[in-house]
């Protein structure tokens, strides 16, 4: 808390009208001012530092501290000032300084005694010892002196108390009333004017004991007579005539309790005095007049309610008359009016008393009685019945709900209390619709879910099953065609009330009102009212649609699109013809809400159907923004379609699968995830297409013809790719073995390297498949993984078809060399299905004569490209969201292939180029033993290469399990280990 904050104050000054004027905000300080010769309070303006206040702390000035943050004092006779502090600490600091100057204790609230307050403080001590007030003799000639004496006693509380005691003890009031009769008989106008002033001042004494005397049955009319002769009025009022003759007391059921009867009469007359005869309270606000009189009336009403509530016999008679079918309309009207006053008096009870009161009425059958009186044609009876129902519902809606639920099994649905109230609301014939508006308030309170407890679901089910049809009947009847059927003002007002209740239901009842609106197609009927000639009704229908859109419920949105419900709104906007009024602002706000909340369904629907109408509107940017947002949606969809449908020559194209939503409510979040996944997946697809294009260019038309002639294996989006891979790999392997004769002698290093890397790629794909199966068991499958399961199964089949032809060709080559190496041939046949044996056989079959070595190497390169592409795509599918793993595996396992730079590895290319030829290959005359030795060496190298490829994949997947293999010998294996 800083010093500036503590000392920040507002300065107030009291004006001539006794109102506080704000003189500015600033910071207060207490300092010695030489000019004033003392400690002064200085307030400087917060804005410019100008001096707002310079007030010397006077030793005899009364400073008062109020509410911990307010200091009030007077500068002179008629100039009051006040400082309102922002912080309590600052107020305490200034207050301590003031008390220090005046030598007072800072704990006091007032530094000096105030005259009026000092009299109050001394009143209790002086009340017994002070001399009584001597009133002049009660004579006709002394009326002026009596009036002046009473007027002079009103200045202090002590003198008021003494005067009250004198008036009460000496029966002075009755003596004055006797003089009133004398003056009235003599037509003594001056005396009557003095008596008016005397009794008006007696009311200002605010003493309940004097009220008891004046309001007694034998004196109250004389007091009213004295108050008729107001000097400011030329002719006296005739209050007594009204109370005695015009005011009629009607008893629907005779009251046998005389005390109760007297109390009712007294309360009515005193209420008349307060409301009609006495001046308005605003004139006497400073004297706090009429508070005791109001309390007198209040306690009278409480006593009346208690006495009636305790008289069970009387209440039974009242309700018997009310529910008796033979009771006349006049008597029933009087009974209802009596109950209305009874309920009005009960408003003065405490909450516990009110609860007991309404429970008593409910047990006696007040709600059953209201079912009869609400449908009466007499306006007074109906109005009083609605007032009673309003009082009950406002205090305890639970009572009415429980009663309504108990009526669910009643065969006469139309006679239910809630339906009766709705019918009376819709049938109100008054021009101002006072009854309809009052009943609308009752229905809203009953339908308010916040004040419902356990009966919420049951009552709403009851309402939407039995009552809502009655409520919306006028709307359905008036919207049969495409325009409102009845356009008179009375009907439009009633329809506006119905729309108000429906809007309330849309806002507070999510489930029930949604089902009702959608099943009955009611929203379309309501929007017919947008063509009404009454603007308030058009706004009511638009308000209902706006509340529905505010819910952002996709069920509502799809219903709006399906039924083209924006068309009436757009038509109303066009008919408004650009007039700047409430209707246009409301329509613009509706579309602005759609823009701000980014409601995609409605945005697309609006732009596709109505954007051309709003293209020329320049004074708001809402519609341009909606159009731009729509274009963004469309561009995104076009990119997705282009990705799915693109073609490149005769090569197969990978198609991304469709996106599946688990829940419509998660549309926006999953839409963004879908686009992110599509972007990553597209990169892998492009890489594959580039590789396949390079393979096609290198192999020429022969490979393409083989691809075209291969039958499809699946209807999967990826079946074209898999068939092409199988055909390319099979044909390449066959060409390699058939184009180069098998020899047991030396082999080409380039062919050996190509075969080794081809087999490593095949085993890399197998390892990727195994890794994917483990991931499926360890984690839940996301929607994208579930989508790619059929493609993964297809990959397994296609990889088997890639490996099988190669194994068959390799076995044939191995059998040709069986005479030279029976041991190697046997091992290759036994392990033809394993990755390591396939690698060994490939190495043996690759030994050929120098003339065919270049062709074999070229074809092996093509097979390697196809195998690498297969392994790359398989690892992409298997890891789904881990593209980095796929890229690393492809980089480590691919050989140097110039037609496919996206998957080549320069390091491996250099390593293969530097490999020295084996000793057996350089010998011109080698025997069977040398051939076997060469074959064994090649097999070991191939095993190492295959194992390295598998280990590299696992290492990239995050498992640090690479170790030096015992077979990893020789410069080639060591070089590959370092590269891994």
Curated annotation (Swiss-Prot):
A GO cellular-component term linked to this record: chromosome, centromeric region
Biased composition (Polar residues): 695-708, 929-939
Cytoplasm listed as a keyword: yes
TM segment ranges: none
Region Disordered, annotated ranges: 640-668, 695-861, 885-980
Subcellular compartments: Nucleus; Membrane; Cytoplasm
Assigned keywords, A-Z: Cytoplasm, Membrane, Nucleus
Alphabetical list of Pfam families matching this protein: EVH1_PP4R3, PP4R3
Chain intervals with Low complexity compositional bias: 709-749, 757-789, 803-859, 885-926
Biased composition annotated in UniProt, kind: Basic and acidic residues: 940-951
Stretches with biased composition (Acidic residues): 953-968
InterPro entries in the cross-refs: ARM-type_fold, EVH1_PP4R3, P4R3-like_central_dom, PH-like_dom_sf, PP4R3-like
Gene Ontology biological-process entries: asymmetric neuroblast division; basal protein localization; DNA damage response; DNA repair; negative regulation of peptidoglycan recognition protein signaling pathway; regulation of double-strand break repair
GO molecular function, one term: protein phosphatase activator activity
Domain of life: Eukaryota
Loss of function: phenotype: Mutant larvae exhibit hypersensitivity to the anticancer drug cisplatin.
Tissue/organ expression: Expressed in neuroblasts.
The keyword Nucleus appears for this protein: yes
Span of domain WH1: 1-105
Role according to the record: Regulatory subunit of serine/threonine-protein phosphatase 4. The probable PP4 complex Pp4-19C-PPP4R2r-flfl (PPP4C-PPP4R2-PPP4R3) is required to prevent caspase induced cell death (in vitro). May be involved in DNA damage repair. Key mediator specific for the localization of mira and associated cell fate determinants during both interphase and mitosis.
Subunit details: Serine/threonine-protein phosphatase 4 (PP4) occurs in different assemblies of the catalytic and one or more regulatory subunits. Probably part of a PP4 PPP4C-PPP4R2-PPP4R3 complex containing Pp4-19C, PPP4R2r and flfl. Interacts with mira.
Family: Belongs to the SMEK family.
Protein name, UniProt field: Serine/threonine-protein phosphatase 4 regulatory subunit 3
Organism: Drosophila melanogaster
């Amino acid at each position: 808390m800083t010093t500036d904050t503590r000392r920040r104050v507002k300065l107030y000054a009291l004006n001539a009208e006794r109102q506080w004027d704000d003189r500015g905000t600033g910071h207060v300080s207490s300092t010695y001012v030489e000019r004033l010769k003392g400690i002064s309070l200085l307030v400087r303006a917060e804005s410019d530092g100008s001096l707002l206040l310079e007030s010397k702390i006077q030793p005899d000035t009364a400073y008062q501290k109020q509410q911990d943050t307010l200091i009030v004092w007077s500068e002179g006779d008629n100039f009051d000032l006040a400082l309102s502090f922002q912080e309590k600490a600052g107020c305490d600091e200034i207050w301590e300084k003031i008390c220090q100057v005046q030598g007072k204790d800072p704990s006091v609230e007032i530094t000096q005694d105030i005259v009026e307050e000092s009299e109050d403080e001394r009143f209790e001590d002086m009340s017994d010892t002070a001399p009584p007030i001597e009133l002049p003799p009660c004579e006709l000639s002394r009326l002026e002196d009596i009036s002046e004496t009473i007027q002079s006693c009103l200045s202090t509380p002590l003198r008021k108390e003494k005067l009250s005691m004198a008036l009460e003890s000496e029966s002075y009031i009755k003596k004055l009333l006797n003089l009133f009769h004398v003056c009235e008989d003599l037509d003594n106008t001056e005396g009557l004017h003095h008596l008016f002033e005397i009794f008006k001042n007696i009311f200002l004494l605010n003493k309940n004991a004097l009220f008891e005397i004046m309001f007694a049955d034998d004196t109250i009319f004389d007091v009213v007579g004295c108050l008729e002769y107001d000097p400011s009025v030329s002719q006296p009022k005739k209050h007594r005539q009204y109370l005695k003759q015009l005011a009629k007391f009607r008893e629907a059921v005779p009251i046998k309790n005389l005390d109760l009867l007297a109390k009712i009469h007294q309360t009515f007359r005193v209420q008349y005095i307060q409301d009609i005869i006495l001046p308005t309270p605003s004139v006497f606000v400073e004297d706090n007049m009429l508070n005791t009189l109001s309390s007198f009336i209040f306690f009278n009403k409480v006593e009346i309610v208690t006495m009636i509530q305790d008289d069970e016999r009387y209440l039974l008679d009242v309700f018997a008359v009310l529910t008796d079918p033979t009771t006349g309309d006049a008597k029933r009207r009087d009974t209802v009016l009596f109950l209305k006053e009874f309920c009005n008096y009960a408003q003065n009870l405490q909450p516990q008393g009110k609860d007991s009161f309404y429970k008593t009425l409910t047990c006696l059958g007040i709600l059953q009685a209201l079912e009869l009186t609400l449908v009466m044609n007499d306006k007074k009876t109906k109005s009083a019945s609605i007032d009673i129902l309003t009082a009950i519902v406002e205090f305890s809606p639970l009572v009415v709900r429980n009663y309504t639920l108990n009526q669910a099994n009643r065969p006469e649905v139309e006679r239910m209390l809630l339906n009766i109230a709705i019918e009376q609301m819709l049938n109100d014939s008054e021009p101002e619709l006072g009854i309809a508006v009052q009943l609308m308030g009752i229905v809203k309170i009953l339908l308010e879910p916040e004040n419902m407890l356990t009966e919420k679901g049951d009552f709403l089910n009851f309402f939407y099953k039995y009552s809502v049809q009655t409520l919306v009947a006028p709307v359905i009847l008036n919207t049969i065609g495409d325009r409102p059927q009845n356009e008179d003002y009375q009907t439009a007002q009633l329809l506006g009330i119905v729309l108000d209740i429906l809007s309330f239901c849309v806002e507070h009842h999510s489930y029930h009102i949604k089902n009702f609106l959608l099943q009955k197609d009611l929203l379309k009927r309501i929007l017919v009212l947008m063509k009404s000639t009454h603007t308030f009704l058009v706004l009511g229908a638009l308000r209902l649609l706006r509340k529905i859109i505010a819910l952002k419920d996709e069920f509502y949105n799809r219903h709006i699109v399906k039924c083209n419900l924006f068309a009436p709104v757009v038509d109303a906007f066009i008919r408004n013809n650009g007039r700047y009024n409430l209707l246009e602002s409301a329509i613009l706000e509706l579309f602005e809400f759609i823009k701000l909340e980014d409601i995609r369904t409605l945005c697309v629907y609006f732009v596709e159907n109505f954007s051309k109408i709003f293209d020329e509107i320049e004074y708001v940017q809402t519609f341009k923004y909606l159009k731009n947002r729509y274009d963004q949606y469309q561009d995104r969809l076009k990119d997705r379609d282009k990705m799915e449908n693109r073609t490149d020559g005769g090569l197969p194209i990978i198609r991304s699968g469709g996106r599946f939503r688990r829940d419509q409510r998660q549309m926006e979040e999953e839409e963004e995830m879908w686009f992110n996944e599509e972007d990553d997946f597209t990169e892998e697809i492009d890489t594959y297409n580039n590789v396949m294009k390079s393979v096609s260019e290198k192999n020429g038309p022969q490979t393409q013809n083989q691809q075209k002639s291969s039958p499809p294996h699946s209807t999967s989006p990826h079946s074209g790719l898999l068939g092409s891979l199988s055909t390319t790999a099979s044909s390449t392997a066959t060409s390699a073995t058939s184009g180069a004769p098998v020899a047991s002698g030396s082999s080409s290093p380039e062919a050996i390297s190509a075969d080794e890397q081809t087999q490593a790629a095949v085993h890399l794909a197998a390892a990727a498949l195994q890794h994917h199966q483990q991931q499926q068991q360890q984690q839940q499958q996301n929607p994208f993984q579930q989508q790619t399961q059929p493609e993964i199964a297809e990959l397994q089949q296609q990889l088997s078809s890639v490996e099988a032809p190669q194994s068959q060709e390799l076995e044939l080559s191995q059998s040709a060399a069986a005479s030279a190496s029976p041991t190697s041939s046997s091992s290759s046949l036994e392990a033809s299905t394993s990755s390591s044996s396939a690698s060994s056989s490939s190495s043996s079959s690759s030994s050929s004569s120098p003339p065919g070595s270049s062709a074999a190497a070229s074809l092996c390169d093509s097979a390697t490209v196809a195998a690498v592409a297969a392994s790359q795509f398989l690892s992409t599918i298997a890891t789904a969201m881990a593209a980095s793993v796929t890229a690393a595996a492809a980089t480590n396992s691919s050989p140097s292939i110039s037609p496919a730079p996206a998957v080549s590895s320069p390091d491996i290319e250099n390593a293969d180029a530097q490999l020295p030829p084996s000793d057996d290959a350089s010998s011109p005359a080698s025997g069977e033993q040398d051939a076997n030795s060469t074959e064994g060496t090649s097999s070991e190298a191939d095993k190492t290469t295959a194992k390295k490829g598998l280990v590299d994949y696992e290492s990239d997947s995050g498992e640090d399990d690479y170790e030096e293999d015992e077979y990893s010998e020789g410069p080639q294996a060591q070089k590959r280990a370092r590269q891994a």
